[in-house]
């Protein structure tokens, strides 16, 4: 009996997490821009569950140092992120059918509000199951920030 309870509890937990993901998002540039802001805020809160709703199972990211990260690797790293926040600017979105992308600039701030990095990013999305999901991301570090 105990053997059956564990898988059932696990399935219910996964279903509850999936139920919290947004539904019926519009297929608009504005929706993608809002998603990027929500993603940045979730990273600042170290909220891996919120980010998990925003990235597709096959998500891959090319980091500023050129290393590649899968969805699970990226999500596992979120709780270990340094304290701080992300300030997104210069964002542009484009939607073509079920695909879209956002390009922008992320100013990474330390807890005092000082800019510690400037990162140009491009995120590619697909519209699936009534919501936008990131398929891929790429970041480029824009020079060193004086400390």
Q: Locations of the language-model features?
A:
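A beta-strand edge to alpha-helix "cap/lid" segment located at domain peripheries
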Residues: 19-53, 58-147
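Bacterial N-terminal signal peptides
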Residues: 2-15
């Amino acid at each position: 009996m105990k053997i059956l309870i564990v898988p059932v509890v696990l399935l219910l937990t996964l279903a509850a997490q999936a139920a919290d993901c947004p539904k019926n998002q519009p297929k608009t540039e504005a929706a993608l821009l809002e998603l990027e802001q929500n993603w940045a805020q979730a990273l600042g809160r170290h909220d891996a569950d919120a980010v998990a709703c925003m990235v597709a199972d096959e998500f891959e990211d090319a980091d500023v140092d050129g290393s590649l990260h899968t969805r699970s690797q990226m999500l596992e790293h979120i709780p270990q992120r340094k304290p701080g926040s992300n300030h997104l600017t210069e964002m542009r979105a484009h939607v073509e059918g079920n695909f879209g992308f956002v390009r922008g600039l992320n100013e990474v701030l330390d807890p005092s509000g000082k800019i510690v990095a400037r990162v140009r990013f491009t995120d590619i999305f697909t519209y699936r199951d009534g919501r936008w999901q990131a398929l891929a991301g790429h970041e480029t570090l824009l020079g060193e920030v004086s400390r």
